[in-house]
Amino acid sequence: YNPFAYIHSEKDILKLVTTLIANTKGEGKAGDDFWVKAETLLYTALIGYIHYEAPVEEQNFSTLIEFINAMEVREDDEDFKNPVDLMFEELKKRKPDHFAVRQYAKFKLSAGKTAKSILISCGARLAPFDIQELRELTAYDELQLDTLGDRKTALFIIMSDTDDTFNFLISMCYTQLFNLLCEKADDVYGGRLPVHVRCLIDEAANIGQIPRLEKLVATIRSREISCCLVLQAQSQLKALYKDSADTIVGNMDLSLIHISEPTRRTP
């Protein structure tokens, strides 16, 4: 599964970055969104460059990691330019209004020490993608998510029940799936997919956060898409989606609750 394979516009880049930020951890101070915003600018710039300028076989997270690794910062030399700086300078000469160039220029407003801290946070957030297993998993795509509503298809996404290291990939997959199918329903099929797509999301609280899920569950049904969230307890949804949890439940057509007896202990 390669999330880059489903990027077709600047809007798709922003959606991918939002999902990445929501389901991974950086090194910024808790409660301070400065680092998150700064990272967002950098990811948007680099992914924009990769999508629009890199060969197809290099459009993946491995290339993003290589870009981050090449971004050396020297606090005592503000005029120093790393390979990525030079790469963007060359692109700016050819395409001064390029989406990636504009985003990178905003990131470069940060001073040397601040830029170094941002890069450290990026490295921490992207650490899972530096594992060989995940590099291979995201090197190319064979899921063809945008075809699920064209014909009857069964796609099983299986995660480990003991290790949640890679669970954020599943939330990323669902986010792209919903966006792709909604756009295809509207642009190709006049508003409704020819084949109903039913997503049975077991352990929904353990796959990471799907951005804007409270709005998605209210709008996807009209496109012949349905979503069934399976939870151990409704409090799990509250812990993950905070104030949006009640809205998510309210936008569901049906709620089934299985009440189990508490374990009785003999004295």
What are the roles of these predicted feature ranges?
Residues 232-236:
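Conserved H-loop
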Residues 14-18, 251-253, 264:
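Short, intrinsically disordered, charge-balanced linker/junction segments flanking boundaries
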Residues 1-225, 240, 257-258:
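P-loop NTPase motor domains
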